[in-house]
């Protein structure tokens, strides 16, 4: 079927009648069979019908989606809990473009522990990677300075891996000598022992510092009774450090033992801002912000969606025993049961009436209102910038979808390109694309940005569909790059697309057929928007270039190992993911990789640990 259902009422009614009034999941597809949206409902028929009954009441974004729907699929489940789990899996698998209910507020940092690695790292990040299920994220934290201070204290209290990569191949660095690192780079501590230390560190960021102190106090007493005074002193120093850490944490709430989350929102006609405050052991340790589109839904339903999306991705230990909400949630009993099952113990959902709990909700609501004001100001700024852009470029309509392209290389080596997309002035990362330049003329020692831009333009726009047609294309460069792209578009019959180039030096805007560049004032909203778009394309291209260069350098390192061909190199990289991890792996760990075996493992280990060859009886000279 290629005709949207909204244009064929008979077909639509027939299709809706086929959908049962049972719990389950529905999938909406477009003319190309792409999944546009995945949803779940207690009554599938009623929920799906609501999209087509009063379309004028839908938000502009959902109206655009409904106008593309050509087919509706459904999967019936036994209950709503199964539907929720299935919806989650389908969204993760297909990543439908209209399933962006909530957007993480990226200004809040997390602490990540990479449990997926043999020797986990601790680092601060603003992006949660959901594709690595073993890694754990703690936070978010409102004060990145305090988080860095906390992490610095933790690394002084516990001997931890201090670097992402070893400083030396054949010896430890100063951190080992002063007791800051247990010698991870040289395998002086086993992964099992190191993970025991990381488990203690994780307790700090789970709000279990008091419990950890009690555990260390018991170990200190045991060590002293066994006359192991060195270990006892180490535990004593760790306890003192943890007590110092507790003093530097955020303001305590009246009950110093309580752990709970609190959700509240503020909304206007277009959007809702949700805030989630995290209280652990009586301390306000984190805050998470979401922005949701206001589709005219009840505030309680918006809060419920935010709660579901947040806790779907949480580790059970991150779910507190009590969650406060500003409003009573429509599916209160179901959600309470779902959260309790996920955590493995009772979780209470409460819309508080008591003074102390109500005051916490009021605090969260005030913060949500402040965030709504800030978000609306940014949205107004972007809307004004887009209107100004249409004015200065003489566009027929205010542009919604902006695309930018940049090339990144070092003298022609590892040449790549980026495509970034802004929709309504904001990054739409699900539409970002990366390209490896295939042109044989672009090679180390010989760069050609014109040819690279032409290649990317042909690869992108020869496959363009009406749904992903840009309203404006920005090329990073000058007249030459613009001419190269326009020649390709003319060849494809697409030279009607609005295309401009932005030169870095003077921030001049070049338009096709106009030899005189357009110069806008430094604070012009249109210029600032184009600069943000161009800079994002540059960042994305540079990150991909560095990734490709690093992979090539890693491959060249492995090429030097005798008997290690491309296939085995691939096996190693799939298992360890980096040269640094291969370097610190033991001979037994290397041999356990399928396709490697003891003999090749020995050669790999000796390459990274040349001192072992002198100690090996196989290499000793016979006298």
From Swiss-Prot:
Specify the superkingdom. Answer: Bacteria
Q: Which PROSITE patterns match?
A: GIY_YIG, UVR, UVRC
* All copies of domain UVR, residue ranges: 210-245
**SUPFAM superfamilies assigned to the protein according to its UniProt record, in alphabetical order:** C-terminal UvrC-binding domain of UvrB, GIY-YIG endonuclease, RuvA domain 2-like
Show the GO MF annotations: DNA binding; excinuclease ABC activity
Q: Where is the GIY-YIG domain?
A: 21-100
List where in the cell it is found: Cytoplasm
Concerning CDD domains, the annotation shows:
GIY-YIG_UvrC_Cho (cd10434)
**InterPro entries in the record:** DisA/LigA_HHH, GIY-YIG_endonuc, GIY-YIG_endonuc_sf, GIY-YIG_UvrC_Cho, Hlx-hairpin-Hlx_DNA-bd_motif, RuvA_2-like, UVR_dom, UVR_dom_sf
Q: What is its main location?
A: cytoplasm
Q: What does this protein do?
A: The UvrABC repair system catalyzes the recognition and processing of DNA lesions. UvrC both incises the 5' and 3' sides of the lesion. The N-terminal half is responsible for the 3' incision and the C-terminal half is responsible for the 5' incision.
Cited NCBIfam families:
PRK00558.1-5, uvrC
Protein family according to the UniProt entry: Belongs to the UvrC family.
Task: Give the quaternary structure.
Answer: Interacts with UvrB in an incision complex.
What name appears for this protein in its UniProt entry?
UvrABC system protein C
- What is the organism field in this record? Synechococcus sp. (strain JA-2-3B'a(2-13))
């Amino acid at each position: 079927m290629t005709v949207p259902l909204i244009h064929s009422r008979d077909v639509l009614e027939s299709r809706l009648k086929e959908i049962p009034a049972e719990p389950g999941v529905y999938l909406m597809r477009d003319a190309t069979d792409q999944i546009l949206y995945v949803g779940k409902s207690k009554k599938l028929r009623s929920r799906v019908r609501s999209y087509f009954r009063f379309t004028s009441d839908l938000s502009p974004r959902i109206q655009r989606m409904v106008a593309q729907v050509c087919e509706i699929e459904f999967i019936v489940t036994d209950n709503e809990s199964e539907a929720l789990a299935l919806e989650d899996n389908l969204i993760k698998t297909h990543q439908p473009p209209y399933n962006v209910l909530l957007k993480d507020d990226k200004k809040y940092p997390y602490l990540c522990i990479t449990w997926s690695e043999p020797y986990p790292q601790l680092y601060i990040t603003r992006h949660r990677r959901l594709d690595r299920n073993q890694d754990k994220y703690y936070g978010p934290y409102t004060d990145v300075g305090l988080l860095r201070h906390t992490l610095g204290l933790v690394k002084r209290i516990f001997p931890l891996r201090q670097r992402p990569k070893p400083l030396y191949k054949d010896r430890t660095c100063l951190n080992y000598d002063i007791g800051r690192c247990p010698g991870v780079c040289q395998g002086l501590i086993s992964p099992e022992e190191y993970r025991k230390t990381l488990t203690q560190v994780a307790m700090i960021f789970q709000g279990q510092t008091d419990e950890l102190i009690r555990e260390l106090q018991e170990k200190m007493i045991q060590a002293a009774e066994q006359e192991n005074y060195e270990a006892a002193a180490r535990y004593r120093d760790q306890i003192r450090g943890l007590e110092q850490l507790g003093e530097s944490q955020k303001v305590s709430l009246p009950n110093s033992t309580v752990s709970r989350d609190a959700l509240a929102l503020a909304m206007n006609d277009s959007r809702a801002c949700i805030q989630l405050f995290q209280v652990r052991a009586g301390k306000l340790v984190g805050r998470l912000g979401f922005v949701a589109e206001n589709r005219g839904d009840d505030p309680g339903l918006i809060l419920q969606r935010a709660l579901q999306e947040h806790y779907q991705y949480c580790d059970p230990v991150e779910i507190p025993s009590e969650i406060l909400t500003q409003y009573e949630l429509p599916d209160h009993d179901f959600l309470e049961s779902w959260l309790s099952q996920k955590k493995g113990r009772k979780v209470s959902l409460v819309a508080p009436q008591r003074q102390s709990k109500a005051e916490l909700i009021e605090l969260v609501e005030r913060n949500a209102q402040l965030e709504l004001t800030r978000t609306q100001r940014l949205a107004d700024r972007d809307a004004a910038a887009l209107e100004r852009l249409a004015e200065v470029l003489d566009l027929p309509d205010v542009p919604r979808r902006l695309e930018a392209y940049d090339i990144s290389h070092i003298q022609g080596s590892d040449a790549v390109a980026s495509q970034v997309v802004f929709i309504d002035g904001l990054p739409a990362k699900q539409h970002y694309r990366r390209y490896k330049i295939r042109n044989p003329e672009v090679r180390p020692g010989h760069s050609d940005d014109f040819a690279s831009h032409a290649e990317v333009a042909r690869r992108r726009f020869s496959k363009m569909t009406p749904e992903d047609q840009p309203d404006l294309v920005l090329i990073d460069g000058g007249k030459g790059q613009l001419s190269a792209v326009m020649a390709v578009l003319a060849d494809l019959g697409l030279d009607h697309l609005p295309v401009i180039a932005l030169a870095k030096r003077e921030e001049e805007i070049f338009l096709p057929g106009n030899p005189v560049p357009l110069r806008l004032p430094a604070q012009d909203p249109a210029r600032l928007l184009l600069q943000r778009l161009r800079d994002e394309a540059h960042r994305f291209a540079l990150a991909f270039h560095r990734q490709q260069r690093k992979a090539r350098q890693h491959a060249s390192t492995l090429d030097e190992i005798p008997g290690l061909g491309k296939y085995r190199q691939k096996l190693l990289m799939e298992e360890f993911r980096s040269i640094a991890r291969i370097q610190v792996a033991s001979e037994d760990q290397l041999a356990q990789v399928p396709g490697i075996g003891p003999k090749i493992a020995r050669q790999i280990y000796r390459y990274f640990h040349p001192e072992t060859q002198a100690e090996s009886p196989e290499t000793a000279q016979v006298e």
